[in-house]
Amino acid sequence: MSLENVDPQIPEGVTVSAEDAELLKFLETSKPKIYVVGAGGSGCNTMARMHEMKIEGVKLIAANTDVQHLVKMRADKKILLGKKTTRGMGAGSNPTVGEAAAKESSEEIKASISDAMMVFITCGLGGGTGTGSAHVIAEQAKAAGALTIAVVTLPFASEGKIRLQNALEGLNKLRKFADTVIVIPNDKLLSIVPDLPLNTAFKVSDEVLAGAVKGIAELVTKAGLVNLDFADLRTILSSAGCAVVGIGEASIEAKPDQRALIAVDTAMNSPLLDVDITSANRALINVTGGDDMTLKEAELIVSEVSKRIDPSSHIIWGARVEKLAKKSSIRVLIVLAGAKFPNYELAAAATVAGRQQEAELDLDLLG
């Protein structure tokens, strides 16, 4: 039997036995059904970035109360939340309205993910639709039996106290239903790219969220040097609570014997790892690189991570050669769970107070 009748990943013209053909058919039907739901304006923007990335093996769903924004999205499915509640005019930055809209559309949400094995929910917490709908979507995903992972941002301190308070309330609701909530504080992104205009900073935020989802999903949807299956992923991410993500890359200029360490150091020292990493007791690691990446380098990265977190941690990892990766580059995605999380409300208050003090000092200098 030729490839085109069995599996598009087998080179054309290659034949397989009847037994292998049966196995390949079973593999195709047993692939985990993975969905990404972008909730609200920010979540849909992140989902749009994922569409550009062409994440393998996932279906993209855009869910929003703003019909004008929704119609511009490229997705496998679009859900206009709360047709009666908002009439397609948005939630007005009110999470209560966003929640009501999602509940009105709960049957459509349920039907869209009824066969899911894993559901990612992306949104920017703090606004109306994403904040209000994320936990409703998560509840439906859990009811369907899916491993439910939320990847969310917390607002910039400059967006104000009310938006932060909305975000924290939304986060608490989301944690009740999602297995894992990966939290990315936008203010931490500023420490990576401090001089970017706000609009560009939001795009960086989309890139980080999309990259996190891609890195996790493709651990099970793409073959690699070291493969993981869906059961491995569930072991680490089921009922994991809040988690953080670190991303690191060694440039092509790095020396071959140092690039693995540079990549893991960058990931483990990422400002996005906003926790005491020594207390983390679960880790998910995805290592990708060019065709000159070795298995030994991947193992070195895993070894370095294990040295820096709880010694009794449960670690799973995968490694894959990316055809489009820059030669001599290595990229590491690390998801850490089980660590003690900071009090975001106190941290944000301190940030605001610090900026206010800086402004007062500037005024004193002007005077």
For each of these PLM feature ranges, what is it?
Residues 2-367:
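Tubulin/FtsZ superfamily GTPase core signature
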